[in-house]
Amino acid sequence: MVPWRASDDGFVTPDVLSWYRRFADGEPGALVLEATGIRDVPSGPLLRIGHARFVPGLRELVAAVRERSHGRTKLFVQLIDFLAIKRRPEKEKFLRRFLVLRDEHRERLRALDARAEHANDDELRELLVRLPHPTLLALLSAREREDLEHGFRERVTDVHLAHVAELPRVLPALFADAALRAREAGFDGVELHFAHASTLASFLSRTNTRADGYGNSREGRARLPLEVFRAVRERVGREFVVGCRYLGDEAIAGGSPIEDACAFGVEFARAGFDFLSISKGGKFDDAAQPKVGEAAYPYTGPSGHECMPTVRIDPPGVADARGPFGRNLPLARAIRASVRAAGFATPIVGSGGIATFELAERALADGDCDLVAAARQSLADPDWWKKLELGRGEEVRRCKYTNYCEALDQRHQQVTCQLWDRDLSTPDAEKRTSGEDPRRSSDGRRRLDAPPWSPD
């Protein structure tokens, strides 16, 4: 998830440096930097890498992680592109300003109100405003209903929009340029974001019905992600690590299932990706309806719950309930088996609710994956890797999988962990042991970094 610590114009801040230094304290084998935008466009307090001016701050971040991890932690940056999404509008504002009037609107209104026959556009809009809501919804197209009820969202199939039609021509160079900047900043590699609600995830999806050679068939849907990879590889060279994160299952109606993911995995391995990291769900397609004035959030619907499962993910009484623990490992296992059967040794990264040494070790021993990744558990306790290495597992602060952190992300607030907050009331004691007061969130109520820990 995005921690919301960058500046509003996408630069590394002291809070960003502190955030990643704290993760580096635990000396994990690798850290993947948050989703970082490849375009030089306003995107709020999200890190960006779409211009050379972002490189100095990112270089400082790399140096900070190297220092705090004593050089033991490799550092990758996740590169992402995303299409436009708008907040859910007020009904009156949508009808008076945003709705593009069509002949069908006038024809349907004419059957309801004779005044529509000779009404000008402004008068027609006022007639729409006064309609009962169910009647209005029946008059609008499915896409117009979504724009009204959820907010406007671009799709890769909106090829009537020139900038969407041109994505295959534009994206390879944008990703390649961003990857080169990452190399210049000192990162060990990049993770191309092909998962969840990203642009390239939408190209891989079965919902991608583009008819220009970049949709419909598996080959067509994988074409642009592969072209992006080849452009990146050509730009950064063979020694720079280039992997991707993609979905083992979209978990939406009409979306791509594991069979597609296995086929994509083989093609990605054949192309030369250095690793494949597997996730699930997290789509806008089934997101919950946002409040007026807020944007849809891709982790609020069934696919989002599969992406970031909580302890409540399984209904009561389910005999084979897995809960959030290792929930995506079967997907990683299936993809790994397909890649191996095709003769490739590309490492597969398993993730999703891995919070104990036993589960991580079993996933590796059983052949579910070759590498283990853990986000929420590492947020709860950035030192857990070091504690396990030192035989101090009983001191690990275990994630409760309540998604307290995810709820903050949804509200665009600085992400923290509920397990940290109980220490905030004793800053004096912490200052005596660590030499500094805990950094606090902008509202002053939450610590910004995990409590310090020392093996001594």
Residue map of PLM features:
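Flavin-dependent oxidoreductase catalytic cores
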Residues: 1-456
